[in-house]
């Protein structure tokens, strides 16, 4: 029996917000829009409805190692405990924000919040936006905002080059959006709501050196990266490690995604930030390994097949960086680590 606990009203995580077509491989639904991939995966789960239950609008609030149980809350009033023989932590990531004066004025959003408003609830967060960050998320959300009729005043990026795929950058550049490299936001303008922002040039040490420029906008969208959400793994006593290539603290794991706590597995962005296609493969690896550990029959050779798919997804410069991070946390023999 499998229990899936989902904090949102609808399963699918970030996929339900994604209206663009995914890259990757055919096995991971390349060329399919994110929200449609979520439907495909949900149909796959529903085909095992006698074995899989989904708790929606439910948050796992903590793990208590001494009792070997989780606390969870559904909605705002129902609290209960969960016990499991094996646990896969696929909690994803949380948005990073940056400090600047007036960043608490209404109208400053994370990119994920903007996607939720537009693509889930059909609400425009503003009419003219300053996008902070030119990674894939910043570029994709900029394009989605423009598709919805929002004007993108500019995209500012602190690094000396665009961090996302050039295909995404080219789309918004063709539509007249300037991408200002070695620039960042200095302060937001406004009192009760955002009326503009001041941006500034940066030197090679990321220090503000000017010139400054005022941007008129009613929305500031922050897209400066993600950090793995790993609180449950830490509470379970899993060996953690800070790995810059994986964007934060992550759990050490073996090829089966098993952590130093033999009853806990990790998958997806909780184990390091990369594409959704890799998260889907890691989820299959973790599920296969957990089932095998419980004594259920599994297909021989599947683990090697899934690792081969991961390697094909982790090509290029970004993939090489991720592979470096994986090498830091991958453990061949937990017994050897325990006795080291």
Task: Kindly label every feature range from the protein language model.
Residues 1-340:
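Residues forming the flavin
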